[in-house]
Amino acid sequence: MTSSTKVGGFDNATLISRILFFLVLFGLVSFYLILSFKGLTSEKGIEQAQIGREIARGNNNTTKVIRGAAYWQAKEAGKDIDLTAFHDTYHSPLNPYIYAAVLKAVGGDDFEKFQMNEDMKTVYALDRVISAVAVILFLIAVGINYLLISRIFDVRIAGATAILMILSDLMWKFTQTGLPQMLMLMLFSCALFFIYRTLEASIENRGDISSLVIAAVFLSLLALSHWLTIWIILGFVIYAAFFFHPKGISGFMILGILLMFSGYFLVKNMEWTGNPGGTAFLSLYGGLTQSESVIMRTSDPAEQTYTIVYNINSFLINTTSSMLRQVNELYTNLGSILVAPLFFFALLHPFKREAIAKFRWIVLLMWVMGTLGMAIFGLSESNLDPNQLHILFSPIMTAYGLAFVSILWARIELPAGGILMRYGHFAIVILISAGPLILKFPRETINALSSSGANTVWPPYWPPVFSRTLHNATDDDDVIFSDQPWAVAWYADRISIWLPRKVDEFLDLEKLATDQELSVAGIVITPMSFKGDVLFSQVPFGYSEDFAPLMLDGPTRGALSRAKTSRGGMVSPGLLAKQSQNLRPIMNKYPEVTDLFLNRIFYYSKQRLYNR
């Protein structure tokens, strides 16, 4: 090849393709992180961010979000409860600690530095910082998967997989949630790389304990990112115990490393809650007959808990139906990548290389165990669910799917050595898989440019109201009850208790706060109360929700005020809540009602705020 066709060791075609790849990548990063970014979209992602800020302040692994169930656990365990230093045992610790390091570096531990004081700004700056962390982790994961798949197959399949990853709309959406999925993707990809090296050594009848240990370390870090991934790890432990040398010992060695990494946190969970699984263990019931939020909001979940535990038939039925639903939604949960589900067809193909043939069974076993874990602990219909682990398998399943398609493509009679023969199937797969992103790109760009920066995740969040109004109206020793305590804790930097379902539980938690010389400032009600279509259910809204009148005040006032505008009348806030006999003790304490935003966010307080 002449020098005119080579630049720095690369031929012109390769150089141009790589330049285009990085240009597209830069454009996508700008689009998702700057142009179309509205804020963090996941409640649990927001909660992990505020835990990270507390860690950055030197407050250890504490949270300003108080769950009734966590309070119940601590009380049952006979622990001293301090609402100003409430230990979090719900979230896995690694992601908040990473957020803490980044927030400390940018000064995010100082609330006033990033407080939203300008009316025109609706995106919280620290939301973008958290999202940027996820983007960086995602890009690292793309690179690791390129190296892994190049080792398993070849650079063409690795390159196509990398392109499909960056063109997956779901991958980018996860970077906007605040959830640890991109961290998990990076760690899982690293673990797979060393698992494959261990497998190669095993096939060649030589021991590679170092690769197995490194894989176990990455899997342990994965577990510290999300406890549910322990199910995935168990899948690998089963395979290693039977097929990796030394047999049996390999599996116990992996479990030993996992215990070494997680032991400290298990002991702390036991110390704070009386359960090594902490409050996260109670999320088990999200996969059974009760929703997780119902359990988490109650400060006495024992009755519901025991009912569910002994209902074995319900357990089996719900677990089975959840697994079947996961299979039905697998395509979207794998990032809507056309060839990813073809991994299961690749299981039927007799690959010539033994390592490729055996590695797919490791992946399958880990996926099956992960699917079982998701079924037991609960997975909603949203493909951005915090428990969504399918996305971790998307790159490796995509690679096997591409290999399978390449084998079929090679059997088509096309000119040998031509571009169509070499890259035609890759182009088809990429164009179809990128469809969701391509279709939304123009519309989202126009919307972002026309909104002039007035974008946020509404409903249910409107950060300026919390960051400026609510924060300035309250003090550091104030406690706020809310149906979205994670938003109050993150955007307003105030201790927030998840609004319980019963008045008696509210009064109990209120007494806990006052006994600690804290002041309950009021109650914040937002559209979050209606997130689950509560009016469209078999049980009437309010049947098991004492605060239903409080939640309905906003929509009621909005509807009636519009009807009375022409008559010069306005409906006073708190119309329904003040008529409720159950809520009378509470409304007497918090009589002042302030419409914070568009009849959708109300603040019930002791003292009057200005009326918006």
Predicted regions and their residues:
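Transmembrane alpha-helix segments characteristic
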Residues: 26-27, 160-161, 165, 214-219, ...
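Signature aromatic-anchored transmembrane alpha helix within multi-pass, membrane-resident enzymes
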Residues: 15-25, 209-217, 233-238, 255-259, ...
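Transmembrane-helix signature of polytopic, membrane-embedded enzymes
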Residues: 18-21, 110-124, 140-167, 185-186, ...
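Perimembrane helix-loop-helix junctions
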Residues: 4, 199-201, 231-262, 266
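Membrane-embedded, lumen/periplasm-facing catalytic core of multi-pass transferases
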Residues: 414, 419-487, 521-524
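Membrane-interface transmembrane helices that cradle and orient dolichyl/undecaprenyl
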Residues: 191-212, 222
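Hydrophobic/aromatic-rich transmembrane helices and adjacent perimembrane loops
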Residues: 175, 180-184, 189, 222, ...
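Hydrophobic, aromatic-rich transmembrane alpha-helices
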Residues: 140, 145, 241, 317-367, ...
